[in-house]
């Protein structure tokens, strides 16, 4: 069985030796990283903001500061911490940056078009890790498996059109193939044991973006899609969390941004209007969920994402700032607000341009039992 993780193992067993002390492991987090996509159309490169919990300070452009001023690249999109390394997926530069999480210095730059091929490796999008490997999607229609010791390609899997998010469970990876919002998105299931890939058209899935798995149940964040060519395209469908059962998906709840911790989805819906925040508990009712309002003590101007620290349960909401025209400013720095697990406002931190993802500096601490 292959256990696939987003950042770090979350469950451990206590250890006891008849001749020695008893101890257990605890997941801890000492900071967060904000992936800032920049603005490709204005030639603003992306960056990484580091938040240190101990000092409560957000440091901008931490990658550039520790790598001789070198840019992170064009349109970074996702990242994670796995072991003693950090991995950042940089879409527009066709790279995955491998970074020492303590020194923030580059260990390796994986050039995805060289690793997979010019077409196959184009535009890496999202990443997960486990079992000594990272797995990332590319708009070339592939998932790559890369060894985290020698950074060599272990396997590549042909999936659907324009894959986005992915999630692992047991010996499988489920991939959301967006079809670039054209309405014909589908799901791929990779069997890591056999190397076989099943790409499945699913009734009710149009533009899938993320995959969540809880107790073996699969949920898809599916967005609206567009018919026709821009600027005359017409918006169709709805953005929602959907429960996957065979070749059919049924709506669980409205959602545009979502993150999951311990079987609970933390959700933002209608981000371009009057944003709504909620929590959908999938544990007691896996098919429909139990959705309740997430009462944040204060909101943000223009939500751009949500995530939850797996060690503390604290909630992070990304946002654009308000521009002079009264609308979201996509060309200047954004911000992130940090809340307690109950939704009480704690802190606000500035970010770079276009904050788009959060990941956490999670590790494991050994605790002696009394």
Where are these regions (language model features)?
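Bacterial N-terminal signal peptides that target proteins for export
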Residues: 1-2
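C-terminal motif of bacterial Sec signal peptides marking the signal peptidase cleavage site
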Residues: 10-14
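Predominantly soluble domains enriched in secretory-pathway, periplasmic, or organellar proteins
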Residues: 16-370
């Amino acid at each position: 069985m292959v256990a696939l993780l987003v950042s770090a193992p979350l469950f451990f067993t206590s250890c006891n030796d008849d001749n020695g002390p008893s101890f257990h492991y605890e997941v801890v987090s000492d900071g967060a990283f904000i992936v800032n996509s920049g603005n490709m159309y204005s030639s603003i490169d992306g960056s990484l903001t580091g938040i240190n919990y101990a000092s409560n300070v957000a440091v901008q452009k931490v990658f550039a500061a520790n790598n001789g001023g070198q840019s992170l690249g064009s349109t970074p999109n996702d990242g994670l911490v796995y072991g003693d390394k950090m991995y950042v997926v940089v879409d527009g530069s066709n790279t995955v940056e491998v970074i020492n999480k303590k020194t923030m210095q580059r260990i390796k730059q994986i050039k995805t078009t060289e690793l997979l091929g010019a077409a196959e490796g184009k535009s890496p999008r999202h990443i997960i890790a486990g079992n000594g490997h990272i797995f990332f999607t590319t708009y070339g229609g592939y998932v790559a498996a890369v060894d985290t010791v020698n950074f060599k390609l272990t396997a590549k899997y042909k999936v659907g059109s324009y894959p986005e998010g992915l999630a692992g469970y047991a010996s499988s990876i489920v991939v959301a193939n967006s079809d670039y919002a054209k309405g014909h998105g589908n799901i791929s299931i990779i069997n890591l044991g056999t190397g076989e890939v099943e790409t499945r058209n699913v009734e009710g899935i149009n533009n899938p973006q993320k995959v969540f798995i809880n107790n073996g149940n699969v949920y898809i964040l599916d967005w609206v899609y567009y018919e026709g060519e821009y600027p005359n395209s017409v918006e169709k469908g709805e953005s929602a969390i959907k429960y996957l059962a065979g070749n059919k998906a049924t709506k669980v709840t409205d959602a545009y941004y979502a993150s999951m911790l311990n079987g609970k989805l933390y959700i933002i819906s209608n981000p371009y209007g009057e944003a709504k925040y909620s929590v959908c508990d999938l544990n007691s009712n896996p098919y429909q969920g139990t959705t309740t309002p997430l009462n944040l003590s204060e909101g943000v101007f223009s939500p751009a994402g949500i995530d939850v620290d797996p060690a503390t349960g604290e909630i992070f909401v990304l946002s654009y700032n308000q521009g002079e025209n009264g609308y979201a400013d996509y060309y200047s720095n954004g911000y992130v607000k940090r809340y307690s697990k109950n939704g009480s406002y704690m802190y606000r931190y500035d970010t770079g341009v276009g904050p788009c993802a959060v990941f956490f500096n999670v590790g494991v601490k050994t605790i002696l039992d009394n």
